[in-house]
Amino acid sequence: MSAFTPASEVLLRHSDDFEQSRILFAGDLQDDLPARLDTAASRAHTQQFHHWQVLSRQMGDNARFSLVATVDDVADCDTLIYYWPKNKPEAQFQLMNLLSLLPVGTDIFVVGENRSGVRSAEQMLADYAPLNKVDSARRCGLYFGRLEKQPVFDADKFWGEYSVDGLTVKTLPGVFSRDGLDVGSQLLLSTLTPHTKGKVLDVGCGAGVLSVAFARHSPKIRLTLCDVSAPAVEASRATLAANCVEGEVFASNVFSEVKGRFDMIISNPPFHDGMQTSLDAAQTLIRGAVRHLNSGGELRIVANAFLPYPDVLDETFGFHEVIAQTGRFKVYRAIMTRQAKKG
């Protein structure tokens, strides 16, 4: 989070307009402009734990991480700058939440890359804060309006649900594979051995489907799940509860909040952060796994076949196996050995 995103660069073209404003930054906060822009006061609210980590170091308690923003999170703000995410339902959840808290008359700015679908903000907010496009640059659009009417926000209405082989999966906007089990996770699940025992860590757990499916065939495993996404953390907790599966679930930037060692780490790691391609999380997962695996423990991940993970696995563990593959995906397995510990 050092260089500014194109969306932030568009905002900087209007920096003089914000000097007297008390701003709430929210949405897809990919850089630290909220901490650096010259304003009368700045707050930030994010559903992404890794974004909060960066911003809180500079903004302290004025940066908040949670699924749902509260009145305290928007206190004294007269302007909202919202970074449009790539996921429209996620934007609707966040904007309806924020606009239900901000006072009528609040200035509303929405900024995002054109390819993210930011133009749909006009229709989404038409009944609450009619928007006009005020700038277009760096393949981004900047929209401005004023809050005329607060929406009614009910987080419970945003929950979704689907079934996988008799299991109930609870989902929220912004959670990976919200509408059904993705092909990569299906492939990874096909490799899991029934009657496994020991401590299992599910990194980037999403809606928790990998963990509950594993637990059904291996009820003696002890589950820990983590994700950077507040919606994913809440969805995983709900999925575990719906299937009567026990496990600890918490927010973590890969291993940042993880304590102890495990017999198995499973993951379908992301390779996007917002609209940007990023292999950082997966590489951190692979390299950090050796500090969180017991001797003889294994890392098992699924990834798009074109992604360059074999070299990182070999550098870290000394070797790896491909235990399942299709034309698009591969499941990699690496074992914690003395050779890996030296790495």
Swiss-Prot record:
EC number: 2.1.1.172
Enzyme class: transferase
Gene Ontology molecular function: 16S rRNA (guanine(1207)-N(2))-methyltransferase activity; nucleic acid binding
Superkingdom field: Bacteria
Location, primary (coarse class): cytoplasm
A Pfam family recorded for this sequence: MTS_N
Entry's localization field: Cytoplasm
Catalytic activity: guanosine(1207) in 16S rRNA + S-adenosyl-L-methionine = N(2)-methylguanosine(1207) in 16S rRNA + S-adenosyl-L-homocysteine + H(+)
Keywords: Cytoplasm, Methyltransferase, rRNA processing, S-adenosyl-L-methionine, Transferase
Coiled coil: none
Subunit: Monomer.
Family: Belongs to the methyltransferase superfamily. RsmC family.
NCBIfam families for this protein: PRK09489.1 (NF007023)
Name of the protein this chain belongs to: Ribosomal RNA small subunit methyltransferase C
Organism the protein comes from: Shigella sonnei (strain Ss046)
